[in-house]
Amino acid sequence: MKLTAFQSKTLLILIPLILLLSTAIYFYGANETTLPKMTVQEKKARFKNLIIPAIDEVYDELMVQYLDVSESLKLGSDNDMIEKLKIEYKAKTDNELLMALKPHPKSIAIAQAAMESSWATSRFFNEANNIFGVWSFDEDEPRIAALKKRGDKTIWLKRYPSIKASVRGYYRTLGRSAAFQKFRQLRLKTDDPYSLVKKLDRYSEKGAEYGDELTSIIKFNKFNTYD
């Protein structure tokens, strides 16, 4: 069905600059690329070897930054650095900046990576290092086209130079987008992944069901052991 001009304009206004839609990934051409046949155990082992080191590294970097900024705010130092970060993360207050910078538990990132990339087998991951299904609306940035369209619109996803860059972009998106304000508010107060995933209903077209699925993935695979 072809979108009207009004629908297209509304879509661009309502959808965050970086749009993440897990339920649309297969339909728009993120189906598995040609890989050697693997058992479920082999597929999960490959996923962990590829993804978890990058998530560990980015999480540690972000936590160091968060703690440094928190200390600077208490001491009233590094004002230039604080102001630059507020601009980058669209934070108006010190508290909003801390909300933006605090990284959420790794178990959530791992579970989302597994879901969005079909355990690192999706085309978008293997051709563009895009493990979290991040959409692109900037024609000047590196990106990859989906194989199918939404109406007459080509769907574009970001292309990253590395898995680590994809992880860093994912955390930055959740730290900046207005769609995840409630998620940020809660993650400043708690590190409980099962409470936090309930606030990711706007990450996916699945809505509240998305959080339930993440909870199941975390529990079944014991991803909370990485927190």
Residue ranges and their predicted role:
Residues K2-A111, M115-D227:
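Catalytic cores of secreted/periplasmic lytic hydrolases that degrade extracellular macromolecules
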